[in-house]
């Protein structure tokens, strides 16, 4: 490698919201905050998340349910 043409590498700490801390080398030099890492991501942990059971149709029916009750009377 040629001298004095490559950028300086600095130690960067990437901290996840789950508390996991990863140390990496980077030319940026600023710390990184992560939302998801390999310790807490469902694809890596094989944990399934519960999806929202109701959809747009359920929200619509709930919002306009007062119209059906007035028709029945």
Swiss-Prot record:
Cofactor note: Binds 1 zinc ion per subunit.
Keyword DNA-binding among record annotations: no
Entry's Gene Ontology cellular component terms: ribonucleoprotein complex; ribosome
Needed co-factor(s): Zn(2+)
Alphabetical UniProt keywords: Metal-binding, Ribonucleoprotein, Ribosomal protein, RNA-binding, rRNA-binding, Zinc
GO molecular function: metal ion binding; rRNA binding; structural constituent of ribosome
Residue sites binding Zn(2+) per the record: 16, 18, 37, 40
Family listed: Belongs to the bacterial ribosomal protein bL31 family. Type A subfamily.
Subunit structure: Part of the 50S ribosomal subunit.
Function: Binds the 23S rRNA.
Protein's recorded name: Large ribosomal subunit protein bL31
Encoding gene, per UniProt annotation: rpmE
